[in-house]
């Protein structure tokens, strides 16, 4: 009887350990960060006013306006005749006016009058707007502090 109890207990511990291991969330600094753009409708069309960076399962702190550089490239190439001029194709850095830490996310707010916020380009021929292809590149200039959800310090994420 004792042998059966020992085997049952060993099986119970093995199953419990396996389940506990499967339920653990791995915590590590983010290698890739998910970014999402947000726009709103203004008098002259839609403007991108903020970007949210999601660091996944780590909290982020120690960020400010100088932590990131955001470059915007908007283009109508391939959507219009090559000899037609488009007013709205841009290739420039966005002006960051504010950065907010919100747990695992960082919200970056842009100056909507910096010339690169628009999602449309004006074509002189036909006097019309067409949507632009948008490409944003985010460069992290300085390390950010990262911590686990329970507050455990994970150091800096470069």
Which positions does each model-derived feature cover?
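Sec-dependent N-terminal signal peptides
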Residues: 6-18
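Sec-dependent signal peptide cleavage junction
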Residues: 19-31
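Short, exposed beta-strand/loop patches in secreted or surface proteins that constitute
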Residues: 35, 42-44, 95-101, 136
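Extracytoplasmic/surface-exposed domains of secreted proteins
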Residues: 49-67, 103-150
């Amino acid at each position: 009887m004792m042998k059966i109890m020992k085997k049952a207990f060993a099986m119970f511990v093995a199953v419990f350990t396996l389940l506990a291991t499967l339920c653990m969330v791995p915590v590590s600094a983010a290698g890739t960060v998910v970014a999402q753009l947000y726009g709103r409708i203004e008098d002259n069309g839609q403007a991108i006013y903020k970007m949210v960076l999601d660091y996944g399962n780590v909290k982020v702190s120690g960020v400010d306006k100088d932590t990131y550089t955001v470059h915007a490239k908007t283009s109508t190439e391939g959507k219009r005749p090559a000899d037609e001029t488009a007013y709205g194709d841009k290739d420039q850095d966005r002006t960051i006016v504010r950065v907010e830490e919100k747990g695992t996310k960082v919200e970056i707010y842009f100056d909507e009058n910096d010339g690169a916020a628009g999602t449309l380009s004006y074509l002189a021929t036909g006097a019309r707007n067409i949507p632009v292809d948008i490409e944003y590149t985010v460069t992290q200039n300085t390390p950010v502090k990262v911590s686990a959800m329970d507050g455990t310090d994970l150091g800096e994420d470069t």
